Amino acid sequence: MYKSENAFSKVLSLKLKLLGYSVTRIETGLTCQGVPDMFVQGNGTDFWLELKNEKKLTLETTKLKVHWRPGQQPWAYTYYMQHHKNKYTFTTIAGDNCFVLVSMKKVFTDNVVMLNDECVFKCKSLTELMETLFKEVNNAK
């Protein structure tokens, strides 16, 4: 769907900004290990997004090995727990013909995500991904 994670990032950032959110792209080389790609704030909330681009991901996919770098899952889960389970980090994955939103409420063994997990949402479009994201963020309030 997107040629690269950077291309996905640009489209997602633009859509979030058009909805009134402030988006800060994090340069990973300048931060500690595990910090996600984007910090998003606005409309009375804030959350982190880790972005992935996985061309092999399709609507038919049931299990996915996510290419999290060392420290990314622990950082996200620790952030969630330290904020009393009301602040979120999500991994958003752009696939070939779908998107996946992973709410980082737990650590996934061996980076394997079952797409029927209660923390995982498969979406057919970027619009559906964003609607699901905002629904999850608002559930935390």
Q: What is the predicted function of each stretch?
A:
Residues M1-K141:
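Catalytic phosphate/metal-binding cores of nucleic-acid and nucleotide-processing enzymes, i.e., regions
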